[in-house]
Amino acid sequence: ASSSGPVQPPQELEVSTPAGRLSRFYQQWSIITNNQLVLDWLKGYKLPFITKPFQHTSAHSVTFANRQKRGMGIAINELLDQGAVRICSPCSNQFLSPYFLVQKANGNNRFILNLKNLNTFLQPPHFKMEDIRTVSRLIKQDWVLSTIDLKNAYFLIPVHKNFTKYLRFQFEGHLFEFVCMPFGLCTAPFVFTKLIKPILHLLRSKGFVCVNYLDDFLLLSETFEQRKSDTAFTVQLLHSLGFIINDEKSLLKPKSICKFLGFVFNTQSMRIELPFKKRQKIFVMLQNIRSAATLRIRTLAQFLGLLCSVCPAVKYGWLYTKQLERDKFLALQMHHNNYDARMSISSLSLQDFSWWSYNIWSGDNNIRRHLRS
């Protein structure tokens, strides 16, 4: 694909903070799309409640141990610096949610607003997302690949001023509210996917071969020079629309081997495999579950979900999850669907664990084979 064409990405604007950043690039967006819903979101996303949210009791301030409190304080200060949250005053019909921290891959903490209760007042529409199957259908022998990872993706979308009161939390006697889209909002994946559609349409109209999953882009082409040119154009286009590229997580220099959506694709061998860290994580979990006399049904269900997610890269992996699924089903039946009840692993499942313990290190798969399963 040539990066020349009638539509050239406009120049990037200088904007200091990431929160709600896309709103300052409205003019550039209006060049590539006339979708009024998308353009309205850029002015401020209005949460599409099916009924007006209410709380019988507000979420109380959570008490943390000193170490947790320090970590929470650091995370909230980072949100303030990014402009993602602001201190606010109480108002009628506000909605307060609890929150917690999760550790990111780099060891830093990410603040998560627990919007489980608020999400009951929202109903995200059904929509399709591109995934590993999309990649497997497009990829060809000896093609070169590059990836682009977007930084602070959800935070770039502004929330309309009339709806920030539903995204509030308390910490150390202060009241805060998100002014941009937080993690945990059930409609966020739909909004972000629809927001990216005009970009994909433009790229594909110019002949680019690309796949997108939320904040991750994969670009594919036949030659190194073509992919280098296409990648440069795509990066410039994304910058011009207000997106921030995460250089550390992106692979901007095209290669025949790259990681995308938690898998490693190799176009020379046309194989798909797992990164070392994911293999290691599964192996450790296998050993822990194997050595435990009993475990919660929930723990097995989570582990099963992880095993199923990696099966595209482990040949015959699906076959060695069936007995575990049966163990889970029988345990839930016995304990009246109580996922917190304890269970033991059957001898047949322990045999499957032995298979996984070996194949998690040696296994890979033909890129197209899993499409037939």
Where are these regions (language model features)?
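Reverse-transcribing Pol proteins
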Residues: 1-127, 174, 211-216, 314-345
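Active-site palm subdomain of RNA-directed nucleic acid polymerases
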Residues: 37, 189-238
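Conserved pre-motif C helix in the palm subdomain of viral-like polymerases
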Residues: 79, 143, 154, 174-208, ...
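A short acidic-Thr-Gly-centered motif at the start of a beta-strand
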Residues: 91-93, 98-108, 130-144, 365-373
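Conserved catalytic palm subdomain of right-hand nucleotidyl-transferase polymerases, strongest
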Residues: 106-119, 135-159, 299-302, 373
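Catalytic palm active-site di-aspartate
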Residues: 114, 149-151, 184, 205-224, ...
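C-terminal reverse transcriptase regions that engage the nucleic-acid substrate
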Residues: 123, 177, 252-371
